[in-house]
Amino acid sequence: MKPLIAIVGRPNVGKSTLFNRLVGRRKAMVDDMPGVTRDRNYADVNRFDVPFILIDTGGFEPETSDRLLQQMREQSQLAMDEADLILFVMDGRDGLTPADVEVVEMLRRVNKPVFYVVNKIDGDRQENAAGDFYSLGIEQIFTISAEHNRGVNDLMEEVIAALPNKTAPAVDEEVTRIAVIGRPNVGKSTLVNRLLGVERVVANPTPGTTRDSIDTYFNCNKKRYLLIDTAGIRRKGKTTEKIEKYSVVDSLRSIERADVVLIVIDAEEGVTEQDTKIAGYAFEAGRGCIFVVNKWDAISKDNASMGIFVEKIRMEFKYLPFAPIVFVSAKTGQRLGKIMTEVDSVMEQFAKRISTSDLNRVFSKAVEEHHAPLYQGRRVKFYFATQVGTKPPSIVIFTNRPDGVHFSYERYIINRFRDAFGFTGTPMRLLFKGREGRKRG
């Protein structure tokens, strides 16, 4: 399990600038997929060959204008509760503020690494002006300019050295790992209890990697499954005071460890922006995805209602057209059996491997029927394709212009592979590599 680093601080101190600096320019295919939120406030980062999840808590601030100190308290509480390491950012141009001082006092009581960062220090003149911050009595303060990349590498070397070693517990590869994610009060807790209770599980709780986490094994139709962080789902499902926008943080750890993710949506409330944000991370993490529309029993409906709701999901989650949709009532148990049927189906596709000959038969025909657009006035040539991984299915395509393949053509190729081989419920990864040789089309 990857460690989680939270960036906290009052608005406009440069949290987002530091976040973007550390994330860098993402080259993943997802960047060009329609519907994926561009203003992400969480990301997978690899620094000095160490992977971690980075959270910009500034992105979780309420849109309405609340009191500044209240916002800072909420951000800091989030960091203290969820993160493995905290970067507390202050503004070197504004100087030390009373709000900064209060949060520092809160962070002194945290039993995890805290790094105190003074941003917007662009040169020696600003460095000298940052002396006020040393009055906090903190042993080490890092002065940086996130905008100009000054001091950032030195900071991150220390941060990486301080990260805890997050080793995930060994899990039987034959077990399908399921994460249940969604906004507060969509019925995750009831759904989990139903799944465990209906299947008459004899649970063997094992400690997970998250705080107070319990993973629960259960059996269904002679197969073994692992529900991730069931204690966390139950506990957090009862917490009403937690700000809704923070709920995405609760999902990150579970998604990282899952094979298949159940994205729970409230039928009464419909699809919200937060739903798309949480689902987007499951997609980017490359997990099998199933939409579970809960509370279907609680709404007035007619013969067209289900079709209308499906269209709404497909419109709002354009990057997940392959994900099955199940309509259930966790409260009554209606259609719950359909969930496990879909889990088995998605897991089979998630781990599917296609032979190179079959793959190239479909690929060659796709290229012949629809050539790639010209790149810098030259034709993009393709040589062959081969599957290099599963969970999710990952395919390398050799070409003379790996940078010249438009994202729309990537989608075309993926859709042709899906038409031929299925891959229902699972993302697919395409990687284009350069090679000279005999072309396929």
Swiss-Prot record:
This is GTPase Der. The keyword GTP-binding applies. One of its GO terms (molecular function) is GTP binding. Residues 352-436 form the KH-like domain. It comes from the Bacteria. Keywords: GTP-binding, Nucleotide-binding, Repeat, Ribosome biogenesis. GTP 1 binds at residues 9-16, 56-60, 119-122. Signal peptide: none annotated. GTP 2 binds at residues 182-189, 229-233, 294-297. HAMAP family: GTPase_Der (MF_00195). Residues 3-167, 176-351 form the EngA-type G domain. InterPro entries: G_ENGA, GTP-bd, GTPase_Der, KH_dom-like, KH_dom-like_a/b, P-loop_NTPase, Small_GTP-bd. The keyword rRNA processing does not apply. Gene3D superfamilies: 3.30.300.20, P-loop containing nucleotide triphosphate hydrolases (3.40.50.300). CDD domains: EngA1, EngA2. Associates with the 50S ribosomal subunit. Transmembrane segments: none annotated. Pfam families: KH_dom-like, MMR_HSR1. Belongs to the TRAFAC class TrmE-Era-EngA-EngB-Septin-like GTPase superfamily. EngA (Der) GTPase family. PANTHER family: GTPASE DER. GO terms for biological process: ribosome biogenesis.
